[in-house]
Structure formats: structure tokens, C-alpha cells
Amino acid sequence: MTKSQDIIEITNHYGAPNYHPLPIVISEAEGVWVKDPEGNKYMDMLSAYSAVNQGHRHPKIIQALKEQADRVTLTSRAFHSDQLGPWYEKICKLAGKEMVLPMNTGAEAVETAIKAARRWAYDVKGVAKDQAEIIAMKGNFHGRTLAAVSLSSEAEYQRGYGPLLGGFKLVEFGDIEQIKSAITPNTAAVLLEPIQGEAGINIPEDGFLKQVRDVCTENNVLFIADEIQAGLGRSGKMFATDWDNVVPDMYILGKALGGGVFPISCVLADKEILEVFNAGSHGSTFGGNPLACAVSNAALDVLVDEKLAERSLELGEYFQSKLKEIDNPVIKEVRGKGLFIGVELNEAARPYCEQLKELGLLCKETHDTVIRFAPPLIISQEDLDWAIDKVKQVFSK
């Protein structure tokens, strides 16, 4: 038995079976490449669901981690830290928002945005007590917490977790008329992913996000953009809402905010929204901790200084063009923005992901029939050519 097999066996024996990973153990990583304990090398085309946009173990981010770990790692929010304020300023200026509320995981940030929207509806908009509604999209993925699965349209995500939370309405993603029809005087917010990741890299028609912005403004409804996966350069823009040149009332960020090194997430909005919170009304022991802020500060610098959004746009167009050249009836569609690409098949995608793994390329199926390609944004064109060669091999069989 190899070391990898032994580790997988131990993991399966002691771990709850809530994941179905490809049978590979990663023990080392750098840039776009990872290794298993046996020394086999693989290209990472998943980026930990877009958390590793800056590449594995980016030296500037690792240096920030080490330096901060030698100073102070956790203060709780009972005290100030010298990292929190400067990080607040940096992320607010990047997003063009007045305030930020830090958390740790994406799902926590979604919960925070929902709480903010509801309290805003009661305290600012004047919605009657416990009547606030939030409109979300079918096919959404906002996390695994109870609120997040309560607004999901996937029955399996909800099975056995009832009673679910109320106050959510679901409409078709991309259908502005359904959103208009769903709005009532009690509507607090419209919550959506500008590009639906887990649903199969679903991209709305050009102009849809602008329509959502306009409808929300007309009806005094908050527009909340969950940019956890599609944001921070992944789509070829700093924020995926930039594709329609719109600014939501709230950004939800996570994943690449920590540079693939440390978990950190946040909600960004203007004062009118986030000032609905008062001391003790929301919080997190680890949210905004010094280590996370130092790491995120470096991660944001890397995104901006290395122009990773622009790089994603250029290389994404190149990679998509090469994928579209593959002539195979199994391939139904190639779609994406930047280096956030889905190849939809006419059959199950996992067997193809397993074949690609054997050729040294790691990717993951999503929504059963879609192969998601989302490499670190630091990837080179030469590496993309290598990846294309492997994909062509699999689809030439």
C-alpha cells in the first residue's frame, strides 16, 4: 500500500462522509503545481474553488504570514489590533465602500449579509417585524449553513435539515421579470452570484446585472452580490459585477481574500447599511484576527500589483478559444469569463476528471455534467498549452 492509499484509508475511516474527493493526496504545492507523497506532479486547475487565485504559497503572502505569526496571531475583537484598521482601509478602498465587517468563511459572510439586510429592512426601510423577505436565485450556492441551505433550490442540500428558515423567495437566475414580480413592500434584498459557480459556471446575459441594479434602486431593495468565488480577479474583472459596470449595495467576499493561506471573509457596504449593527449584535472571535488581516493585506497587494484580473481576462480568452477547438460530440458547450470556465458535457463529467487526473491535471466536476477549469491566475500560457494537450487527449479517445 502506498502512503497516499494509507492516508485515504485513514481519512475515510475517521472522517464523516460529506465529501467525495478524487483519490489523490496533496502533500506539497507551489504556484500552479502540486505533488502527492509519492512525488507525482499535477497541475491544479481548481484552485481550491478559487481560493488560490494568487497561486499556491505565493512568497509575498507566505512572508506576511510568517512575519505576523512571530508577532501576534489572535486578540479577539475585545481589543484592537494593529492589522485590522489598515486592512479595513485597504479593502474598503478597493471595493469603493465605506464600511466592512470581517468574518472567517464565505458562509459566515453570507449569514452576516442576510442579518444586515433584514435589520436594515426593519430599522431603515420600515418593514413590519419578522416580515422581511430576501429574493435569491434558483441554482444558487451560498454555503452550507442553515440559512444558506434554506435558500437553496437543491433538495439534497436541504434533506434532513428541517425545519428550514423562512423569508426567502427563489426565482430563475437571469430572469428580471421574475425578480420584478417577486418584489413586495417587504423585500429587503436581492441576493445573487454574478456568475453561478456550483451550478455549472452559469453566466447571465449581458445587461442582466444592470437590470437588477435598476430594479433594486427603484424599489428601495438592497442588491447583494456574492462574489466569494467569482470575485477578486477570477472572472477577468476585480469583481464579476464589473462586467455590467454596476456596483451592488453589498459585496460578499471570501476565498481568495486569504490568498489560499488563511481563511478570511467579509461583507462590504456603505454606512447606512452596516451601521444597523451595534456592539454585541454580531461578531466572531476569529473574524478580522491579526494573522488573517496580515495575510489578506498581502493577498490583495498581489492581486493588484501583479494585475491578476487583467491576466485572467487575457489568458481566459485564450484558454476558452483552445477548448472550443476540440471537436467532440460529448462537449455541449464551453462557457466562462476570465479563468472561470465550464465545459458542459452531454454525459457525466466525473469520469473525464478522473482521466485527466491520471494525465496529471486536477479539476472537478460541478453540477454532474460540467467540468470546471479554474487554475490559479498566475498560470502561464505555456502551462495552459500543456493543460489543453491533456484535455485533447481525453476527448480524443
From Swiss-Prot:
Superkingdom of this protein's organism = Bacteria
Which compartment or compartments is the protein found in? Answer: Cytoplasm
Cofactor(s) demanded: pyridoxal 5'-phosphate
Which GO terms label this protein's molecular function in UniProt?
Answer: identical protein binding; ornithine aminotransferase activity; pyridoxal phosphate binding
Modified positions (N6-(pyridoxal phosphate)lysine) in chain numbering? 255
Which cellular components does GO assign to this protein? cytoplasm
UniProt pathway: Amino-acid biosynthesis; L-proline biosynthesis; L-glutamate 5-semialdehyde from L-ornithine: step 1/1
In terms of InterPro entries, this protein maps to:
Aminotrans_3, Aminotrans_3_PPA_site, Class-III_PLP-dep_AT, Orn_aminotrans, Ornith_aminotrans_bact, PyrdxlP-dep_Trfase, PyrdxlP-dep_Trfase_major, PyrdxlP-dep_Trfase_small
* BP GO terms, sorted: L-proline biosynthetic process
- Could you say which EC number(s) this protein's record lists? 2.6.1.13
SUPFAM superfamilies found in the cross-reference section: PLP-dependent transferases
Q: Which UniProt keywords apply?
A: Amino-acid biosynthesis, Aminotransferase, Cytoplasm, Proline biosynthesis, Pyridoxal phosphate, Transferase
Q: Report the catalytic activity.
A: a 2-oxocarboxylate + L-ornithine = L-glutamate 5-semialdehyde + an L-alpha-amino acid
CDD domains xref list: OAT_like
Q: What class of enzyme is it?
A: transferase
Enumerate the Gene3D superfamilies for this protein.
Answer: Aspartate Aminotransferase, domain 1, Type I PLP-dependent aspartate aminotransferase-like (Major domain)
Biological role stated in the UniProt entry:
Catalyzes the interconversion of ornithine to glutamate semialdehyde.
Q: Which HAMAP family match?
A: Ornith_aminotrans_3
- State the family it belongs to: Belongs to the class-III pyridoxal-phosphate-dependent aminotransferase family. OAT subfamily.
Q: What is this protein called?
A: Ornithine aminotransferase
- Output the lineage of the source organism: Bacteria, Bacillati, Bacillota, Bacilli, Bacillales
